[in-house]
């Protein structure tokens, strides 16, 4: 027969054991006592970050690099024959690709199919089903509503100058950029970084371009002895005044500054002169 006193001692031992296995204070608080009043909030955020890390990496089955490389699978891709489009939308009930190629109307020809057992949707399109420069979006249906969306993995997004509305754009130029500098290894002893913003680095009172930066600013950076440039606001963002902090398309270089080919030319020229690009 277990007495009340024995139960109490047993529970206390369990509590003491659990407390002994937990750090008294998290590292941030140990290093900065002024954070002690906020320790619970900080610990909660840290625990949430670890949870999110596990979710993104499938509890370690893939790496964060694998997750970040999702654009190689998702989005719109040119195949040897035709195109393939994929999107992750687990709560969607229907997805249509709409754009210049079908007069922005929902048609069976451009209706995506859910890949069974996943949250992934896929649509295969014929060679002539779309062309370079076509604008497009997806029309997503879910329980209780629907709406147009820019695909999450779009690699080219442009803004209408009149309406200010963004759309994804098919990007498959007849003559893709050919890299002149095939191999590049930066000098990191030491790494001297020049932080820059393509649009704000020009003398003219306008949004600067990739080409203008390559021709007017890069030579000065080279002359000053830097071996790396870190480009701010390179990912597409709807509000220019946000300095690029309001990212809306993580895999699309901002079209405000020019085309992907012009950005590649800038990077190529930097590499040819020993300049790394972040």
Where are the regions that the model predicts?
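The feature marks proteins involved in alpha-glucan
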Residues: 2-84, 105-195, 200-205, 212
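Conserved, mostly hydrophobic/aromatic
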Residues: 87, 138, 196, 221, ...
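Short proline/glycine-enriched turn/loop motifs at strand-loop junctions of beta-rich domains
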Residues: 88-95
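Conserved aromatic beta-strand anchor motif in extracellular beta-sandwich/beta-rich domains
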Residues: 97-99
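Domain-wide signal for the mature, well-folded portions of proteins, strongly enriched
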Residues: 122-124, 199-202, 235-237, 266, ...
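Hydrophobic faces of well-ordered beta-strands that scaffold small-molecule active sites
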Residues: 192-196, 229, 277-278
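Aromatic-lined carbohydrate-binding/catalytic grooves of carbohydrate-active enzymes
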Residues: 204, 208, 219-265
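Short, well-ordered coil/turn segments that N-cap beta-strands
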Residues: 225-227, 271-275
């Amino acid at each position: 027969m277990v007495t009340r006193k024995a139960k109490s001692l047993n529970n206390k031992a369990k509590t003491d054991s659990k407390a002994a296995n937990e750090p008294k204070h998290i590292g941030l608080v140990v290093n900065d006592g002024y954070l002690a009043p906020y320790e619970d909030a900080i610990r909660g955020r840290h625990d949430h970050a670890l949870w999110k890390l596990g979710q993104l990496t499938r509890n370690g089955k893939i790496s964060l690099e694998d997750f970040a490389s999702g654009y190689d699978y998702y989005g719109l891709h040119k195949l040897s024959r035709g195109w393939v489009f994929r999107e992750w939308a687990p709560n969607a009930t229907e997805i249509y690709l709409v754009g210049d190629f079908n007069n922005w109307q929902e048609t069976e020809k451009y209706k995506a199919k859910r890949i069974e057992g996943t949250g992934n949707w896929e649509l295969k399109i014929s060679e002539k089903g779309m062309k370079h420069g076509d604008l497009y979006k997806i029309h997503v249906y879910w329980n209780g509503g629907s709406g147009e969306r820019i695909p999450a993995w779009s690699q080219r997004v442009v803004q209408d100058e009149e309406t200010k509305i963004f759309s994804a754009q098919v990007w498959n130029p007849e003559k893709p950029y050919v890299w002149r500098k095939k191999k590049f290894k930066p000098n990191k002893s030491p790494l001297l970084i020049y932080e820059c913003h393509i649009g704000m680095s020009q003398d003219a009172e306008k949004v600067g371009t990739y080409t203008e930066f390559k021709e007017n600013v890069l030579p000065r950076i080279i002359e000053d002895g830097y071996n790396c440039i870190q480009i701010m606001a390179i990912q597409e963002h709807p509000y220019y005044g946000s300095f690029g902090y309001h990212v809306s398309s993580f895999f699309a270089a901002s079209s405000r500054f020019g085309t992907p080919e012009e950005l590649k030319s800038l990077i190529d020229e930097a590499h040819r002169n020993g300049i790394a690009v972040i």
